[in-house]
């Protein structure tokens, strides 16, 4: 490996999450020493708005860390030891389309689940591969990419197919946010929990929640039956997951467990198991993308503007599990700590009755050479079947991306549990292709050339 202090590059430096991640790094400098932090983004204007806030966060803790802001990949990645990836291809403008187009057809509109997640995946796979190639060209030969880019399951499958030897660890903060809520309910820090979990990203179940060796899932079941996966005071949840739409999401754990009480579901399973209720309560004219643009994004940009003029930085960003988790994982990679975390890995028999090469989300011990997954064994038929259908949809979408195949994209949309019929799938996909004409040239051409018969 390599020795600290490290050079860290953040790809997607203009993200509203960047200040919180950097703050998490700053409070852990003894655990993860840094020589330099580099922000890299193809949107220079957005990154230049965020960068002064990030520099202020750094300077509040260290005068010696070098800080670089660039849109040049050679400058960004040369000699880097770690790259944190958090790209959002199309930004919130396209997320809004991902959410609103399905809703026009009475189907769940969500960033990473359903047709919206599939569309987002079609935009993100190839740019992620391009990023991997840039890191491979310029960074340290043993550099690790820790990837937060959504939709994580589809991105991870695309990377597995196209760059199977890349040193990329795909992670998601959703299970960790759920663990934070569990810890708050049980009165312990989330790091005191040891969980067993299986599934795909945004599509899995907690099977045990241990505190000092004792399974607390029975206690959590009783609490969830009253309050969902929230403390009695919902304000005590993670600040990044505590606005009204998230409170509803945490409460929806209750009806799922009322029907299927054995395991505790990932919150995103609400979109697959109760889609009609979700659609009934979604506003087709004002979705989560609008909430974020008018909330977190506007607040941070206003704070950046105020800081530019006054030198005062308001409390405009969250330091929560999102930043904490990626730093935990990076520490374990850097120092071979073998910490146990929930991450995405190639299955290789961890879940016995899923395909060997599937990308699954399970506990793993994080070493300097990557994750060593914990064996789950057989999962019940109900869960296996749900997982196989979701996996097939994601794998077909990756094939559609690689081949520029309209038919495989349509198959992927049709297989997704949130989409009721082939007709819905086709109508949504066709509208998505038009909205994404700047991002899906191969698919656009296949559609226009009539690869399959259009109505």
Task: For each feature predicted by the language model, list its residue ranges.
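Rossmann-fold NAD(P)-binding glycine/threonine-rich loop
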Residues: 89, 93-162
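Long, compositionally biased stretches enriched for glycine and/or charged residues
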Residues: 187-455
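Short acidic low-complexity segments
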Residues: 66-79
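Glycine-rich phosphate-binding loop and adjoining beta1-alpha1-beta2 segment
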Residues: 27-62
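Redox-cofactor binding/interface segments in oxidoreductases and associated redox assembly factors
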Residues: 78, 84-85, 147
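Conserved glycine-rich cofactor-binding loop
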Residues: 14
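Internal, well-ordered domain-core segments that constitute the primary functional module
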Residues: 131-214
């Amino acid at each position: 490996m390599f020795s600290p202090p490290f050079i860290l590059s953040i790809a997607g430096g203009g993200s509203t999450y960047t200040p919180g991640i950097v703050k998490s790094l700053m409070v852990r400098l003894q655990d993860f020493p840094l020589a330099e932090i580099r922000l890299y983004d193809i949107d220079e204007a957005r990154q230049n708005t965020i960068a002064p806030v990030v520099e202020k966060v750094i300077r509040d803790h260290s005068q010696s860390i070098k800080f670089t802001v660039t849109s040049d990949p050679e400058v960004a990645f040369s000699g880097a030891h770690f790259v944190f990836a958090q790209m959002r291809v199309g930004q919130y403008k396209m997320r809004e389309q991902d959410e609103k187009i399905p809703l026009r057809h009475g189907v769940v509109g969500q960033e990473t689940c359903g047709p919206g997640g599939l569309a987002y995946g079609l935009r993100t796979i190839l740019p992620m591969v391009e990023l991997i190639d840039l890191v491979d060209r310029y960074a340290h030969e043993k550099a690790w990419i820790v990837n937060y880019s959504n939709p994580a399951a589809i991105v991870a499958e695309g990377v597995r197919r196209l760059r199977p030897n890349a040193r990329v660890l795909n992670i998601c903060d959703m299970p960790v946010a759920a663990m934070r809520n569990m810890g708050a309910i049980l009165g312990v820090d989330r790091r005191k929990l040891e969980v067993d979990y299986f599934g795909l990203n945004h599509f899995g179940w907690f099977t045990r929640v241990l505190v000092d060796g004792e399974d607390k899932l029975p206690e959590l079941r009783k609490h969830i039956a009253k309050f969902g996966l929230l403390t009695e005071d919902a304000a005590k949840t993670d600040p990044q997951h505590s606005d009204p739409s998230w409170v509803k999401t945490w409460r929806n754990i209750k009806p799922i467990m009322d029907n299927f009480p054995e395991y505790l579901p990932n919150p995103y399973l609400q979109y697959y198991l109760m889609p009609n209720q979700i659609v009934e309560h979604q506003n087709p004219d004002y979705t989560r993308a609008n909430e974020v643009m008018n909330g977190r994004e506007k607040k941070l940009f206003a704070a950046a503007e105020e800081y530019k003029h006054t030198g005062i930085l308001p409390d405009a960003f969250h330091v929560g599990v999102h930043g904490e988790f990626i730093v935990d994982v990076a520490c374990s990679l850097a120092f071979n700590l073998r910490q146990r975390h929930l991450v995405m890995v190639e299955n290789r028999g961890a879940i016995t009755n899923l395909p060997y090469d599937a990308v699954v989300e399970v506990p793993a011990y994080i070493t300097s050479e990557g994750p060593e997954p914990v064996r789950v064994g057989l999962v019940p038929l109900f869960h296996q079947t749900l997982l196989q259908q979701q996996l097939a949809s994601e794998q077909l979408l990756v094939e559609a991306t690689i081949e520029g195949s309209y038919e495989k994209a349509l198959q992927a949309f049709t297989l997704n549990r949130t989409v009721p019929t082939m007709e819905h799938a086709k109508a949504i996909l066709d509208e998505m292709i038009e909205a994404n004409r700047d991002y899906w040239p191969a698919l656009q051409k296949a559609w226009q050339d009539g690869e399959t018969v259009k109505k």
